[in-house]
C-alpha cells in the first residue's frame, strides 16, 4: 500500500515556548492517531517545518486544515511524494516535535539547512533527507 508524504514550512504568528510546542504536539498526536497519520514537526527561528505521512486523502485534508490555522502564516509546500507504506519515516510516532533552537546537540549542518529553507534558498540537504536525519537524531 502507498502513503503520501507531505512537507511544508510556515511562520508562527506568535513565538512558541516549550510548553506551547508540547501542547500542540500532544493535540496533534491524539488527532493523528485517529487518522493513522504519522510525522515530525521541527520548530526553529519562529518557523515550523513539518512532515505528514498517511493516506493521500487524509494527508491532503489535514494539510488544508493546517493551512487555515491562525497560529501560523505563509504556509509553503516543499515536498509531496507517494511512497510505499514501509518507507514511512516516523511510523512509531503519530507526531514528534522538537525545538531546533534549544536542542544543544543538534547538528550544525541540519540547523544551517533549516535556515536555507526558511530563507527560500536551495537547501544543502534535500528536505526528505533532512527528515531522515531528524529521525536519527530523535532515536527512532
Task: Set out the residue ranges of the language-model regions.
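Charge-rich, low-complexity N-terminal segments
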Residues: 1-140
Amino acid at each position: 500500500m502507498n502513503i503520501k508524504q507531505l512537507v511544508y514550512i510556515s511562520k508562527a504568528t506568535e513565538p512558541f515556548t516549550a510548553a506551547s510546542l508540547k501542547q500542540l504536539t500532544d493535540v496533534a498526536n491524539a488527532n493523528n492517531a485517529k487518522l493513522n497519520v504519522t510525522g515530525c514537526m521541527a520548530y526553529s527561528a519562529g518557523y515550523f517545518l513539518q512532515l505528514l505521512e498517511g493516506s493521500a486523502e487524509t494527508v491532503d485534508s489535514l494539510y488544508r486544515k493546517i493551512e487555515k490555522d491562525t497560529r501560523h502564516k505563509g504556509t509553503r509546500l516543499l515536498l509531496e511524494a507517494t511512497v510505499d507504506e514501509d518507507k514511512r519515516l516516523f511510523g512509531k510516532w503519530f507526531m514528534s516535535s522538537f525545538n531546533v533552537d534549544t536542542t544543544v546537540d543538534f547538528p550544525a549542518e541540519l540547523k544551517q539547512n533549516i535556515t536555507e529553507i526558511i530563507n527560500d534558498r536551495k537547501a544543502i540537504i534535500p528536505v526528505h533527507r533532512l527528515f531522515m536525519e531528524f529521525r536519527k537524531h530523535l532515536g527512532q
